């Protein structure tokens, strides 16, 4: 109610739909921003296709939800730490995704194929131009980057590096309650 970070989620049909699903489920929205985003991600990863009557049988669909979330965290933090950047050059994104999959023994997926499947499945990451991608909303990148920094015990390092940059306020807002 009146939270600008939540209000910005109403700017796109996909994100507005997620808020409506959350509200319909509980007849209210979570008070904590991190809880709202956690639920929205859960809905996208677990319920989005099912609610629309889809069942996909792809390599991406066979990845565990935890692996998917860890991949999003890794990509969000990688690109955030480089500037921070909310737009990802396609070639670099494909390369990072492929190396992440190899490093963690995930099914033999190419980075390009995996990102395209993510885009088709639920749109957490989407094409933003002919040769670049981004998270469907900057706040998703902030949320996943914050989760990465906290789970890897790098939140203090991030705060020391970026504390004076306004563009980092969103990540910091997510780090505090995590």
Region roles according to the model:
Residues 1-18, 113-114:
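Amphipathic alpha-helical segments of the small helical/lid subdomains adjacent to P-loop NTPase cores
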Residues 2-6, 57-63, 157-161:
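A ubiquitous short alpha-helical element
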Residues 5-7, 36-50, 96-104, 163-174:
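Short, mixed-charge aromatic SLiMs
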Residues 13, 76, 88, 146-178:
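Hydrophobic repeat-domain scaffold segments
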Residues 13-16, 34, 69:
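Generic preference for well-ordered alpha-helical elements
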Residues 15, 71, 140-141, 167, ...:
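Catalytic-loop motifs flanking and including active-site residues across diverse enzymes
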Residues 18-19, 143-144:
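Short helix/loop capping segments that flank catalytic or ligand/cofactor-binding pockets
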Residues 24-26, 30, 42-143, 150-153:
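Extended helical regulatory/linker subdomains that flank P-loop NTPase cores
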